[in-house]
Amino acid sequence: MSSIDRSQSVGGTRTYEVRTYGCQMNVHDSERLAGLLEDAGYVRAPEGSDGDADVVVFNTCAVRENADNKLYGNLGHLAPKKARRPGMQIAVGGCLAQKDRDTIVKRAPWVDVVFGTHNIGKLPVLLERARVQEEAQVEIAESLEAFPSTLPTRRESAYAAWVSISVGCNNTCTFCIVPALRGKEKDRRPGDILAEIEALVAEGVSEITLLGQNVNAYGSDIGDREAFSKLLRACGRIDGLERVRFTSPHPRDFTDDVIAAMAETPNVMPQLHMPLQSGSDAVLKAMRRSYRQERYLGIIEKVRAAIPHAAISTDIIVGFPGETEEDFEQTLHVVREARFAQAFTFQYSKRPGTPAAEMDGQIPKKVVQERYERLVALQEEISWEENKKQVGRTLELMVAEGEGRKDDTTHRLSGRAPDNRLVHFTKPEQEVRPGDVVTVEITYAAPHHLLAEGPVRDVRRTRAGDAWEKRNAAEAAKPAGVMLGLPKVGVPEPLPAVTGGCAVD
């Protein structure tokens, strides 16, 4: 095959590559996009294809500062490749496509398909229509056509899965454009959610993450304010489901019945990611966050009382318009009081289309950077101190795939503790597969991981490990590896590695 017509076609079958940017909702949607394409006869391009697939799909994010620059830079990189290969197709979906529907094809006329957040199920049809009509297809739905979970899927993990319980958001945070792009909250019926989870468990999945822009508001669309706590308890009754997580909740909707369900349901993990955004009441009001510092710390206190070993993480924005030094000191105060295991910190930057972008009092970059560095230094210190408390504890880890970048050179494997802390452990003589469970003693703590340097105390082979082994064997003869444009995407870990819900990300 000449360099002029380089292609990743396999045996005459067209190949695809999906590149994902943004939150867990996009990761979940990308698994559906992959499933739709495989259902239509495409196969995944080999690992590291770098735009050489027959179809390249960008699932975009609209809330990162340079989201559009990144997209158009990547599209520009593909333009000469497509010029050499007329049969190649490029599709752009996700939040940026929903927002910039009218400009993408104008700025990148070599794009074949533009689709939004509400009609991902149309991708194969739009690709075929663009091929036949030889012109770009731009189709954006204004409301959800089908829950992503009802579409075919190509899950990135054999043992862990996302399960969408709702889409959209009813909040109006002034820094966030997500509600405008994903619409008002719409809840799935509990029976549909539980049926999907049971089907996943039957396939070997042992860990699920309940997913929504605001998971603990679940039930508002179906008229049941305790629907989320009931859903957690129902997950506890599913045989074979070992771990349940959820992301992301909103402090306004965090009620006592949810805390009780977390504490009383054994397979709901002792982990909570709850965005703070700011510790200042004045800034929270400007953000339109619907809670104040006292309310937030009160939830933390209740969670710690009910679940003493819970690992709590958060999102924080530094330098929101109008933030004073006193406001920032209030954020530092909450960080000291809450003692987060981890905090995902962001420097505020204008998001076009959001009220905050037009606010007075935009903070100079130098000031934002200085505050950001102080916050990161404080949180690093706290994360390390909290991790040191884990030394000497005996923990059950679910063995993870691809978590430890240095595992090969250190002869270690990696896994997740119940509270989602990352643990690197000594590789045992007995075969251990992703999805299996090992028991180890923690011997060392760093700010972002733990070590178990002694021998593994126990290895429990699981149905999840069986599922991984079966899938791995089946994949051996196929082209492998679609590059999702996120680091560490594939397994829902660490949650939220790239935050969703009410976060800025």
Swiss-Prot record:
Its EC number is 2.8.4.3. It is found in: Cytoplasm. Residues 388-456 form the TRAM domain. Residues 155-386 form the Radical SAM core domain. InterPro entries: Elp3/MiaA/NifB-like_rSAM (IPR006638), Methylthiotransferase (IPR005839), Methylthiotransferase_CS (IPR020612), Methylthiotransferase_N (IPR013848), Methylthiotransferase_N_sf (IPR038135), MiaB_methiolase (IPR006463), rSAM (IPR007197), rSAM_horseshoe (IPR023404). The gene is miaB. It holds the Pfam family Radical_SAM. It comes from the Bacteria. [4Fe-4S] cluster 1 binds at residues 23, 61, 95. Keywords: 4Fe-4S, Cytoplasm, Iron, Iron-sulfur, Metal-binding, S-adenosyl-L-methionine, Transferase, tRNA processing. Its cofactor is [4Fe-4S] cluster. This is tRNA-2-methylthio-N(6)-dimethylallyladenosine synthase. Catalyzes the methylthiolation of N6-(dimethylallyl)adenosine (i(6)A), leading to the formation of 2-methylthio-N6-(dimethylallyl)adenosine (ms(2)i(6)A) at position 37 in tRNAs that read codons beginning with uridine. Binds 2 [4Fe-4S] clusters. One cluster is coordinated with 3 cysteines and an exchangeable S-adenosyl-L-methionine.
